[in-house]
A protein has these predicted regions:
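A generic secondary-structure signal
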Residues: 43, 71-75, 183
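Catalytic-core segments of class I nucleotidyltransferases/pyrophosphorylases
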Residues: 99-100, 129-216
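Well-ordered alpha-helical segments embedded in enzymatic catalytic cores
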Residues: 36-39, 68-71, 180
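N-terminal glycine-rich phosphate-binding loop and ensuing alpha1 helix
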Residues: 1-56
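Residues at the starts of beta-strands that form the adenosine-phosphate
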Residues: 3-5, 49-52, 81, 106-107, ...
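Short glycine-/acidic-enriched loop or helix-start segments at secondary-structure transitions
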Residues: 18-19, 40, 93-96, 119-120, ...
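Conserved beta-loop-beta/alpha segment of the NTase-like Rossmann-fold superfamily
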Residues: 57-124
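Fold-independent oxyanion-binding glycine-rich loops
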Residues: 10-11, 55-57, 86-88, 112-114, ...
Length: 216
C-alpha cells in the first residue's frame, strides 16, 4: 500500500475574512460550529495516512502555497504519495478511491463544474488526462477544487522547488500550486481529472451561503 502524507498549507493571511471582521485565523473559523481545518482534515485523510497542517506557527509568513509546502518538506516522505488540500474547500468524495485512481497515473486533481473567475481551471482529454492548468482564468467549465494527489511526492516537490528557485510567480506575486503542476504537465506527467461535488469556502460570502443552506 502506498504511504501517503497529507499536507494542508494554512499559512496565508486570510485577508478577506479579517477584513469582514473575523478575529481568528482562517483555518480556525467555525463552519457549522466545527473549525474549517478540522472539517477538511476529516474529509481528505486516506486510511493509514499521516496528516500535517502547515500554519504560520510552524513556518512563519510565506510567499504562497508552494513556499509553504516546501518549508515543511522535511515532514514528507519523498517516495510516498502526497495529498495536498487547501483549507477552504469541502469535497463530497471517497478519499481512498481518489488515491486509488491517482495511483493509476502520476496523480489526480479534484475538479468540479464552475465558471467562477477566482479559481484555477483545467482542460482534459477524453480519458480525463489533464492537458492544461491555468490559474484565475476561466478556460473551461472544469474548475480545480483545491485537492491534489501525487503518486510520488518527490516529483511534485522537484517541480515546486524549480518554480521557487526560478522565481516564477503567479497570482498576487505568489508561488502557486498551478505553476508546479503546469511544469509537471510540460514534462509529460499524467495527472487525472477526478470530478466531485465541491463547495468553496474562500470568502466570507461563500461561508455564509453554505451555512445558510444547512440551517434554513
Amino acid at each position: 500500500m502506498t504511504r501517503v502524507t497529507v499536507v494542508i498549507p494554512a499559512a496565508g493571511e486570510g485577508r478577506r475574512f479579517s477584513e469582514a471582521g473575523y478575529t481568528v485565523a482562517k483555518p480556525l473559523i467555525p463552519v457549522l460550529d466545527v473549525p474549517m481545518v478540522q472539517r477538511v482534515l476529516a474529509n481528505v485523510t486516506p486510511t493509514g495516512a499521516t496528516a500535517f497542517v502547515v500554519g504560520r506557527d510552524l513556518v512563519g509568513a510565506t510567499e504562497g502555497t508552494l513556499d509553504t509546502i516546501l518549508r515543511a518538506e522535511r515532514l514528507i516522505d519523498p517516495e510516498g504519495g502526497l495529498l495536498i488540500a487547501l483549507v477552504d474547500q469541502l469535497v463530497d468524495f471517497a478519499v481512498d478511491d481518489f488515491v486509488k485512481v491517482g495511483n493509476t497515473a502520476d496523480g489526480a486533481i479534484i475538479t468540479f463544474a464552475s465558471r467562477r473567475p477566482d479559481l484555477s481551471y483545467v482542460d482534459a482529454d477524453d480519458q480525463g488526462v489533464i492537458t492544461r492548468i491555468v490559474d484565475k482564468e476561466v478556460v473551461s467549465d472544469t474548475a480545480v477544487a483545491g485537492v491534489y494527489y501525487f503518486r510520488r511526492a518527490r516529483e511534485f516537490l522537484d517541480s515546486a522547488r524549480s518554480i521557487v528557485l526560478n522565481e516564477e510567480r503567479g497570482y498576487r506575486g505568489e508561488y502557486v500550486i498551478s505553476l508546479a503542476i503546469a511544469r509537471m504537465l510540460r514534462r509529460g506527467y499524467r495527472l487525472l481529472s477526478y470530478l466531485a461535488e465541491t463547495t468553496i469556502l474562500g470568502t466570507p460570502e461563500d461561508l455564509w451561503e453554505y451555512e445558510k443552506r444547512w440551517t434554513w
